[in-house]
UniProtKB/Swiss-Prot annotation:
<dbReference type="GO" id="GO:0045040">
    <property type="term" value="P:protein insertion into mitochondrial outer membrane"/>
</dbReference>
<keyword id="KW-0445">Lipid transport</keyword>
<dbReference type="Pfam" id="PF10296">
    <property type="entry name" value="MMM1"/>
</dbReference>
<dbReference type="GO" id="GO:0032865">
    <property type="term" value="C:ERMES complex"/>
</dbReference>
<comment type="subunit">
    <text>Component of the ER-mitochondria encounter structure (ERMES) or MDM complex, composed of mmm1, mdm10, mdm12 and mdm34. A mmm1 homodimer associates with one molecule of mdm12 on each side in a pairwise head-to-tail manner, and the SMP-LTD domains of mmm1 and mdm12 generate a continuous hydrophobic tunnel for phospholipid trafficking.</text>
</comment>
<dbReference type="GO" id="GO:0015914">
    <property type="term" value="P:phospholipid transport"/>
</dbReference>
<comment type="function">
    <text>Component of the ERMES/MDM complex, which serves as a molecular tether to connect the endoplasmic reticulum (ER) and mitochondria. Components of this complex are involved in the control of mitochondrial shape and protein biogenesis, and function in nonvesicular lipid trafficking between the ER and mitochondria. Mdm12 is required for the interaction of the ER-resident membrane protein mmm1 and the outer mitochondrial membrane-resident beta-barrel protein mdm10.</text>
</comment>
<keyword id="KW-0472">Membrane</keyword>
<dbReference type="InterPro" id="IPR027532">
    <property type="entry name" value="Mdm12"/>
</dbReference>
<dbReference type="GO" id="GO:1990456">
    <property type="term" value="P:mitochondrion-endoplasmic reticulum membrane tethering"/>
</dbReference>
<dbReference type="InterPro" id="IPR031468">
    <property type="entry name" value="SMP_LBD"/>
</dbReference>
<feature type="compositionally biased region" description="Basic and acidic residues">
    <location>
        <begin position="91"/>
        <end position="101"/>
    </location>
</feature>
<feature type="region of interest" description="Disordered">
    <location>
        <begin position="73"/>
        <end position="101"/>
    </location>
</feature>
<feature type="region of interest" description="Disordered">
    <location>
        <begin position="354"/>
        <end position="384"/>
    </location>
</feature>
<feature type="compositionally biased region" description="Polar residues">
    <location>
        <begin position="215"/>
        <end position="240"/>
    </location>
</feature>
<keyword id="KW-1000">Mitochondrion outer membrane</keyword>
<keyword id="KW-0446">Lipid-binding</keyword>
Length: 437
């Protein structure tokens, strides 16, 4: 099913201008973090324009959103919790307060009640909430994640309580087919606080009850979980590879020593908080083709080394006049948020590869042979998602249509390589952008 987009309406007006300025500012900030070669002093991004040619979109599938889209961030925690969760628990506050005033231990209550919801009990939040939540996807900023398709560390939130059955990374297809992450009966809000709340109210365990399998006698000597996880991740971590490092450190809990230490001490590391799945949540996979006139204006200052090193700086103006793109886009709608990203070539093949292989036949609609098909696929992947970036440069005078300065070509190649890298690092899953609607 194909989609017609009113490109002018979507990219013009105050909202379109604000989005274009936000994209320009984001690309400019990324260039300020790039290590420049010796012959370039600085790179400035001046303008961004969506152009007039819309992309071609073909819907391939409707499915459940990827698991990573349900991770909560602290900025949006207040509105979601106050409106959704607290309203559901308001009728139980009276019963909760009466339970807190009961004797510290009751055998029947302890044996029959499951893990308690932290919203029922007035316990302070765990110190782990802040380190795990500060770096999770600020508004309108992409989040870098663990390389590979999806799963990553989000599986820790799904399977943490069954320590013997931790699953590794999954493909997007497996993540989508996984269904409700809380099908086993464990609620995310009850994972971190239930055991602690019950033990504080119940006091010491009588002798006639079985001894716990985990020795907690030496728990005070164990290092805290916060020491094994990144203590803070600034906003810049979401804009470079440092964000991926933080996710990898969280992922090390699957098979590393920190998990064993906290299991022995009786304190389980808390998984990232996950939003509740709702029936109205959905995700669309689209095959996106674009050969448009999107424009990006940059200036780079070239350093001249004659008659001495870095003798003078000469501004070079670069104009990206269009790009050619072919890939699979993911658009997920969850509550009042829209998550957007692209899939890498390998991940796209895992989801809709069979259809693209049929379409990759020759013009006579005959399927390609094995050698031709593999050569075509490798040729397509060699250029990445951005197959072509058209650029124009302006500096000084020209001779026979060529630039006088020999470093102009080097500057063009460097800038284009950085534009391609920024696109693939910030918009290709597991990185994604979130828009509030």
């Amino acid at each position: 099913m194909s989609i017609d987009i009113n490109w002018r309406t979507a990219t013009s007006g105050p909202d379109g201008e604000a989005l274009a300025e936000r994209i320009r500012s984001f690309i400019h900030d990324r260039f300020q973090q790039v290590a420049l070669p010796r012959f370039i002093r600085s790179v400035q991004v001046h303008s961004f324009d969506f152009g007039t040619i819309p992309p071609e979109l073909e819907i391939k599938d409707f499915c459940e959103p990827f698991a990573d889209f349900y991770e909560e961030d602290d900025d949006a925690d207040t509105s979601d919790v106050s409106e959704d969760l607290l309203s559901e628990h308001s009728s139980q506050w009276d019963r909760t307060h009466s339970e807190l005033n009961e004797p510290p231990y009751r055998e029947e209550s302890a044996m029959n009640h499951g893990l308690r919801d932290p919203f029922h009990e007035g316990f302070p939040p765990s110190p782990l909430r802040s380190p795990l939540g500060e770096h999770l996807n600020p508004h309108f900023l992409p989040r870098a994640g663990t390389p590979g398709i999806p799963g990553g560390t989000s599986n820790l939130g799904y399977h943490l309580m069954s320590l013997g059955g931790l699953s590794g990374t999954q493909t997007p297809l497996a993540a989508v087919a996984g269904g409700n992450p809380f099908a086993s009966g464990w609620s995310d809000s009850g994972m971190g606080f239930g055991n602690r709340g019950r033990s504080e109210r119940q006091g010491p365990i009588p002798q006639h009850r079985p001894e716990p399998e985990i020795d907690t006698s030496n728990s005070t000597s164990r290092p805290s979980t916060a020491n094994t996880l990144p203590s803070h991740l600034s906003e810049s971590n979401n804009l470079n590879a440092d964000g991926a490092t933080g996710r990898n450190e969280r992922g090390s809990l699957h098979n590393g020593d920190p998990l064993a230490d906290h299991t022995c001490s009786g304190h389980l590391p808390l998984p990232p908080r996950m939003r509740e799945r709702r029936p109205e949540d959905f995700q669309v996979l689209c095959h996106a083709k674009y050969a448009g006139d999107v424009r990006l204006s940059l200036t780079a200052e070239i350093l001249l080394d004659y008659p001495m090193p870095s003798f003078v700086g000469l501004p070079l103006k670069l104009n990206v006049t269009g790009i050619t793109f072919d890939g699979v886009a993911v658009v997920a709608y969850i509550r009042k948020r829209v998550h957007f990203c692209f899939l890498s070539a390998e991940d796209a093949d895992a989801l809709i590869g069979s259809e693209q292989q049929q379409e990759s036949g020759g013009d006579d609609h005959r399927p390609r042979s094995g050698a031709d098909s593999s050569a075509h696929t490798s040729q397509k992947r060699q250029g990445g998602l951005l197959q072509e970036i058209r650029v124009e440069s302006e500096i000084g005078r020209k001779e026979n249509g060529k630039q006088v300065l020999k470093n102009v070509g080097k500057v063009e190649r460097f800038v284009l390589a950085q534009v391609r890298r920024i696109f693939e690092e910030e918009l290709v899953y597991p990185s994604f952008w979130t828009f509030l609607i």
